[in-house]
Amino acid sequence: MSAIQLQIANLVNELNQHNIKYYVDDAPSVTDAYYDKLMQQLLALEAEHPELIQSDSPSRRVGGHALDKFSQVTHLKPMLSLDNAFEQADFEAFNKRITDKVGTVDYVCEPKLDGLAVSITYRNGQFERAATRGDGTVGEDITENVRTIKSIPMGLRGDGYPELVEVRGEVFMPKAAFDALNARQQAKGDKTFVNPRNAAAGSLRQLDSKITASRALGFYAYALGVVEGEVQPMEPSHFGQLAQLKRWGLPVSQEVKLCDSLEKVYAYYDDILNRRGQLSYEIDGVVIKVNAIPKQLSLGFVAKAPRWAIAYKFPAQEEMTLLESVDFQVGRTGAVTPVARLQAVFVGGVTVSNATLHNADEIARLGVKIGDTVIIRRAGDVIPQIVAIVPEKRPQDAQNIVFPTHCPVCQSLVERLEGEAVARCSGGLFCEAQRKEAIKHFASRKALNIDGMGDKIVEQLIDKELVQSPADLFGLTASMMTMLERMAMKSATKLVAAIDAAKTTTLARFIYSLGIREVGEATAANLANHFKSLAAVREAGVEQLLEVADVGEIVAKHIRHFFDQAHNLEVVDKLLAAGINWPEITAVAEDELRLKGQTWVLTGTLTQLNRNEAKAQLQALGAKVAGSISKNTDCLVAGEAAGSKLAKAQELGVKVIDETELLVFLGLAG
């Protein structure tokens, strides 16, 4: 190593250690002036010798070249959201579910930061990649922007860290940084941000990382994600793993506390609520997690959230305002929803001018009229709702809210079925509002995932009568697309190609895309795995549908009702005729489940089957598909760039096959 290289390496190491002391240990070891002097020395040396710039140099935090767009990242392990508790009774019910299954537990309590969840990957101790949560499965690559956040180390401290470490945490904007940013925006005549969360989101999603670098974002780690190639055993508790993250140089909130009783959990909640305004960052509740990792694994997950954690939200903020009028909106399933138009009021960090009234029963329960003064609450600090009226402020000319008998969009009759609170337009796809929402849903990422088919394009297609149903999308040509605003031939050709590519999907996605009431992603997947074919789903009676996991009587009736409607069957048949297809899910008799009781693991990149297809095929044969290798693993399927799982399988003597052998085994070769 040359003298210049050694000097640069020493400066990088010293500056990084000072960063950790400042941001992680909260114990600055040098003055700001001294730190700045070291940084200027490093920048000068790097300017003279750009070929010697290290990957973990703090100089890289100033931002690099602007991007054209963010690329997508598939998370190594889903980034789930949390279920919410809004009252003590909600948390007590959560605690009962926990203790009924795994006995007494300790909880870890930590502030629920009002920011953005991110995933950060370190390989061999070096910062490699960062991504947003996105939809939980796929996020956006924000590596260059996260690199500019000074509290996030570019290299892990110490030793003993695994080959691959994924850290989950929250990026936020401190209150002081938010105030300073808005002052700068105002001075320049630019738009100001409503709250720190929006400012953090806007800063993190800048295509130009120099802009991100100019905004003082913070970060706290709150969990480990995927870990591969452990050098030493990981801590068996969440509290221990947070301490481990801090030892590696990652910032962890000082407010985290281990509580061994419900009384201590409630005391923590009350304390942090009382000190909320004194904290340097915005929070909107407390996250409570089961401490013991083995008990977390035993409790497992539901479709969208872990069973072992909950967000205990703070009481929502409330304000009074005037209800000026009520409009009625029609949704994708025909639901007619009354929307209150309000005199704008600032509640919980945002300006609120609309609030849902839900349905006729809710209007009657509130006794609300047009002209009333109402109390607005942001439920969970997110969704504005009217919780009460102020009777003494009611004017003499207050007007009753009259629910429409005919759809405000298509004039079809509005019906309300016995036992249901929601009134619905009977127009189906004849109703323009339902058409628009149905096609938006059909094209959405979790359904057919038509790249580039945004809401505004769908609205134009329907307004120009180019599309009447989802099936009509597949008859569009590039020349037809150019009739839309700001749609040149190149963009039109690209969009038509995306529509064509969406024809190949999965049965679960197709079922979800149909927009059947109460059938979400998880239920659609359960229907696909249970019945194996669309024909079987179409023909299933209510009793057969009730045999499917998570399908109750109401959902079963909705599914049956959907497929009993001639116009729905016509749309489905047109979609199939247009060429929509998916890999066949082979039905296997119980005595033919040749992998029943076996545990398989997939690793690396598969080139002919995607990971979900391979997993579905193995599960159809009775296998459990796990995410990590252990002595109980029966077989590892190793794709390209298999990595540490392959090495561990070989070490444990686990059977290993490649993708070609898997295809032969599944009868899909050739």
From Swiss-Prot:
Binding-site positions, NAD(+): D32, A33, Y34, Y35, D36, S81, L82, E110, R133, E170, K289, K313
Membrane-crossing residue ranges in chain numbering: none
This enzyme's EC code(s): 6.5.1.2
Domain BRCT residue range list: 590-670
Catalysis performed (reactions): NAD(+) + (deoxyribonucleotide)n-3'-hydroxyl + 5'-phospho-(deoxyribonucleotide)m = (deoxyribonucleotide)n+m + AMP + beta-nicotinamide D-nucleotide
GO cellular component: cytosol
EC category: ligase
Active-site residues, record numbering mapped to chain: K112 (n6-amp-lysine intermediate)
GO biological process entries: DNA repair; DNA replication
Keyword DNA repair: yes
Gene3D superfamilies assigned: 5' to 3' exonuclease, C-terminal subdomain (1.10.150.20), 6.20.10.30, BRCT domain (3.40.50.10190), DNA ligase/mRNA capping enzyme (3.30.470.30), Helix hairpin bin (1.10.287.610), Nucleic acid-binding proteins (2.40.50.140)
Cofactor(s) essential for the protein: Mg(2+); Mn(2+)
Keywords: DNA damage, DNA repair, DNA replication, Ligase, Magnesium, Manganese, Metal-binding, NAD, Zinc
Gene Ontology molecular-function annotations: DNA binding; DNA ligase (NAD+) activity; metal ion binding
Record: residues binding Zn(2+): C407, C410, C425, C431
NCBIfam families named among the record's database cross-references: dnlj (TIGR00575), PRK07956.1 (NF005932)
Role, per record: DNA ligase that catalyzes the formation of phosphodiester linkages between 5'-phosphoryl and 3'-hydroxyl groups in double-stranded DNA using NAD as a coenzyme and as the energy source for the reaction. It is essential for DNA replication and repair of damaged DNA.
UniProt similarity note: Belongs to the NAD-dependent DNA ligase family. LigA subfamily.
Entries under HAMAP family matching the protein: DNA_ligase_A
Name of the protein described by the UniProt record: DNA ligase
Organism: Shewanella denitrificans (strain OS217 / ATCC BAA-1090 / DSM 15013)
